[in-house]
């Protein structure tokens, strides 16, 4: 069993379909990383299946949660407006993200 998961990946920033404004932006974690995280966090889960993580995107770092996406079977990471503004990114951009499960 895994004891720790840190993953670095590139992904496209996208807007959640349920909210047409640009306030809900996400990146999708790769399938293999999502499987590793699911294995590491097996058992009782927090609300909505959330998993606490530490994130680095560009020069920005923060603690947040990732959430399982029933459509893809992967976890998704919300990227708040202050981070997008600080990094000069918007929906459609490809970003490099480092995620560490806490």
Model-derived features with residue positions:
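Long, compositionally biased stretches
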Residues: 2-73, 91-93, 98
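Short alpha-helix capping/helix-loop boundary micro-motifs
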Residues: 39-41, 80-85
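Short, solvent-exposed hinge/capping segments at secondary-structure junctions
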Residues: 87-89
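Short, charged beta-turn/beta-strand-edge "cap" motif at the junction between a beta-strand
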Residues: 83, 100-102
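A conserved hydrophobic position in a structured secondary element of the catalytic/binding core
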Residues: 29, 78-79
